[in-house]
Amino acid sequence: MDSKDQHGTKILERLVKGEIGDEELKELIRIRFEKRLQCGYKPTPQDQLASEMAFIKSLKDMKMSGELEAVNTELYELPTAAVAATLGSTLKQSACYFKEESMSIDEAEIAAYELDCERAQIKDGQTILDIGCGFGGLVLHIAQKYKNSHVTGLTNSAEQRNYIMLQVEKLSLSNVDVILADVTKHEFENEKKFDRILVVEAIEHMKNIQLFLKKISNWMKDEDSFLFVVHLCHKAFSQHFEALDEDDWYTSYVLPEGSVTYLSASALLYFQDDVSVVDQWLLSGTHMARSQEEWFKRFKINLEAASKALTVGLGSEEAANQVNIQYKTFFMGYVVQFSFNNGEEWMISHYLFKKK
């Protein structure tokens, strides 16, 4: 590769024209994440801790969330038909759990829901809130398995809410409702509280974790309630997913600037003013990498169907083509990121909290 083509602008120009093949794209992405590791790791343990503490403290001076509107438009309001052409049968957009190597993507979706329910200690008869519920895979799984429970999904995507309510009708479920709202602004009427609150790969869009957890804790029942959080993390350092330098073509291309933060695996331990940690687990990043690999395979197989849905939804073939290129880059980027060091750099953290 000619060195001049490494400049971010040149790479983006070639990418949007469809001039970069899969293997070259993967290598270009790998270079960006190597740079991110170089920036994240510090020379000594003392420097590493000092950097992490400075980051944690900086979050407490920020507003509650990142750019929710931008990320919602780019990721969560795409036509359902286009999304369905890529994901598994329950349209799970967060990491699946490949408990067995031989599992299909559909089986790994269910395995992830089962693991979430086990670690969140979901039981029949509870009231459950799923914040950032996506297309409702976990909501519908819980509602069908725990028939005496009531499950509330909260999403800021009208497309997602409409899809979930269609499934609720098809399945004749009477124990589900879905709220269309921005979690940072929403308040429940009559001070409604829940036995379990689930936040699965949604806290990445928050900045001021202290404010967020304080707000969520007010929705927890005073007795025997738990908050279960799943978030993508780095094992050692926290980092906003923002451009690192002028050659960083990748970061703001795949996600809106300022919309995502990758906390370290231990970062939430510093935010126990309103909740306290009961347990914590760490999953290999390979589960996310494998999920993205499977989605990318389906994306390529169903590209024609996805493109048709995008063309209808976005109004032009050119717009659909650009989203397809962006999606390809997104999938490949996550595969590269969560495969680093055999899945032991960027990983998946699970936390169980109780209300203080």
Curated annotation (Swiss-Prot):
Coiled coil: none annotated. GO terms for molecular function: methyltransferase activity. It holds the Pfam family CMAS. It is an enzyme of class 2 (transferase). Keywords: Methyltransferase, S-adenosyl-L-methionine, Transferase. Gene3D superfamilies: Vaccinia Virus protein VP39. The keyword Transferase applies. Transmembrane segments: none annotated. GO terms for biological process: methylation. It comes from the Eukaryota. The keyword Translocase does not apply. Its EC number is 2.1.1.-. InterPro entries: SAM-dependent_MTases_sf. Signal peptide: none annotated. Disulfide bonds: none annotated. S-adenosyl-L-methionine binds at residues 93-94, 128-136, 155-160. Expressed in stems, roots, flower buds and leaves. Probable N-methyltransferase not involved in benzylisoquinoline metabolism. Shows no detectable activity with (s)-coclaurine, (R)- or (S)-reticuline, papaverine or (R,S)-tetrahydropapaverine. Belongs to the CFA/CMAS family. This is N-methyltransferase 4. The gene is NMT4.
